[in-house]
């Protein structure tokens, strides 16, 4: 194996977020409020299964232990199960997860697990069906809930649920969410609303700090857990009376980036060192055949020298990210 990916600030990178499409069939207010608009990339322009196999092989050789498949909505790809299987070929990759809107969970989750999927994150921003539809533009609440149940039935011991925290939308519904996870092994992750190029007005109206929830959880006796090296950025809390857990993702905290352990590759094969940042490093010309792996690994390693110490969000810098479907959130 080549040397472990490490940047100039001695941060080690064990986690790859790999976008496989930017297409989504939901119209979430904080991501694609006007629905998906093609950016000139056709479905044939997204990374192929073979390209995904090569890029994940290179990252595995460089110490990656976890790959998360993102979008857009990853399950809209007809070859999604094949993609999972291709990533699974790498023995060094111990965890393969997906972030999904849950649209196809009920139908396909058992097949995904058989192909090698080990983790699921489902986006659910409200437990009220009408509010869910208002946020997502889709009347699919019951379908998504059935999908979460199907994930447990398929053998997943835990399901993570992502909830974007929004003032006057769901920030006051903590008790409802806590009741939901009391007897279910769900890690409910509240994610602070992030400002993007297309979402400034929404951010000003609905942003609220996760610190408010953290203070309330601590007041109620929830206990902060230690992170593992391939975990995402969530601060996770547990409580002896609950089967579920609470996670808080607060990107506006000053030291949020100090423990960064993840890199991103977009659906068209660009390496992004940060969700909010530069235009990306093209990898696609080195994904054409298996003989290029050494050069591919060298380019990835060299790019890491340019990774900045922080995303500067706390200094009101939103980078180039127009919306969160662009490189997989």
From Swiss-Prot:
Q: Where does GTP bind?
A: 17, 68, 99, 160, 262-264
Protein residues bound to S-adenosyl-L-methionine? 30, 72, 123, 194
Instruction: Alphabetically list the UniProt keywords.
Output: 4Fe-4S, GTP-binding, Iron, Iron-sulfur, Lyase, Metal-binding, Molybdenum cofactor biosynthesis, Nucleotide-binding, S-adenosyl-L-methionine
Cofactor annotation comment: Binds 2 [4Fe-4S] clusters. Binds 1 [4Fe-4S] cluster coordinated with 3 cysteines and an exchangeable S-adenosyl-L-methionine and 1 [4Fe-4S] cluster coordinated with 3 cysteines and the GTP-derived substrate.
What top-tier enzyme class does this entry carry?
lyase
Q: Where is the Radical SAM core domain?
A: 8-234
GO terms under biological process: Mo-molybdopterin cofactor biosynthetic process
What cofactor does its activity depend on? [4Fe-4S] cluster
- Superkingdom classification of source: Bacteria
Q: Which residues bind [4Fe-4S] cluster 2?
A: 257, 260, 274
Q: In which pathway does it act?
A: Cofactor biosynthesis; molybdopterin biosynthesis
Q: Which reaction does it catalyse?
A: GTP + AH2 + S-adenosyl-L-methionine = (8S)-3',8-cyclo-7,8-dihydroguanosine 5'-triphosphate + 5'-deoxyadenosine + L-methionine + A + H(+)
The catalytic activity of this protein is classed by the Enzyme Commission as 4.1.99.22
Pfam families referenced in this protein's UniProt entry, alphabetically: Fer4_12, Mob_synth_C, Radical_SAM
Matches recorded under PANTHER family: GTP 3',8-CYCLASE, MOLYBDOPTERIN COFACTOR SYNTHESIS PROTEIN A
Q: Which family does it belong to?
A: Belongs to the radical SAM superfamily. MoaA family.
Question: What is the designated name of this protein?
Answer: GTP 3',8-cyclase
Q: Which organism is it from?
A: Escherichia fergusonii (strain ATCC 35469 / DSM 13698 / CCUG 18766 / IAM 14443 / JCM 21226 / LMG 7866 / NBRC 102419 / NCTC 12128 / CDC 0568-73)
- What high-level taxonomic lineage is stated for the organism? Bacteria, Pseudomonadati, Pseudomonadota, Gammaproteobacteria, Enterobacterales
């Amino acid at each position: 194996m080549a040397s472990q990916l490490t940047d100039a600030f001695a941060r080690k990178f064990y986690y790859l977020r790999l976008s496989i499409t930017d297409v989504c069939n939901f119209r979430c207010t904080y991501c694609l409020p006007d629905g998906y608009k093609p950016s000139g990339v056709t479905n044939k322009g997204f990374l192929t299964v073979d390209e995904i196999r090569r890029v994940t092989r290179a990252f595995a050789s460089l110490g990656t232990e976890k790959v998360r498949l993102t979008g857009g909505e990853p399950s809209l790809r007809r070859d999604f199960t094949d993609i999972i299987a291709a990533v699974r070929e790498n023995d060094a990759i111990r965890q393969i997860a997906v972030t999904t809107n849950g649209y196809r969970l009920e139908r396909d989750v058992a097949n995904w697990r058989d192909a090698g999927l080990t983790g699921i994150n489902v986006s659910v921003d409200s437990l009220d069906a009408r509010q869910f539809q208002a946020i997502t533009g889709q009347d699919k609440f019951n379908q998504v809930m059935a999908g979460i149940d199907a994930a447990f039935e398929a053998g997943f011991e835990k399901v993570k649920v992502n909830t974007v925290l929004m003032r006057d939308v769901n920030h006051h519904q903590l008790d409802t969410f806590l009741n939901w996870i009391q007897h279910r092994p769900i890690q409910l992750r509240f994610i602070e609303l992030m400002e993007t190029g297309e979402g400034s007005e929404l951010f000003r109206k609905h942003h609220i700090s996760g610190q408010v929830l953290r203070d309330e959880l601590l007041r109620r006796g929830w206990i902060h857990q230690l992170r593992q090296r391939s975990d995402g950025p969530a601060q996770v809390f547990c409580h002896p009376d609950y089967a579920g857990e609470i996670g808080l993702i607060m990107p506006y905290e000053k030291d949020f980036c100090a423990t960064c352990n993840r890199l991103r590759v977009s659906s068209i094969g660009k390496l992004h060192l940060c969700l909010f940042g530069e235009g990306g490093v093209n990898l696609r010309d080195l994904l054409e055949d298996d003989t290029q792996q050494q050069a591919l690994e060298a380019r990835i390693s060299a790019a890491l020298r340019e990774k900045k110490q922080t995303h500067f969000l706390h200094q009101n810098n939103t980078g180039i990210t127009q919306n969160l479907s662009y490189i997989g959130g």
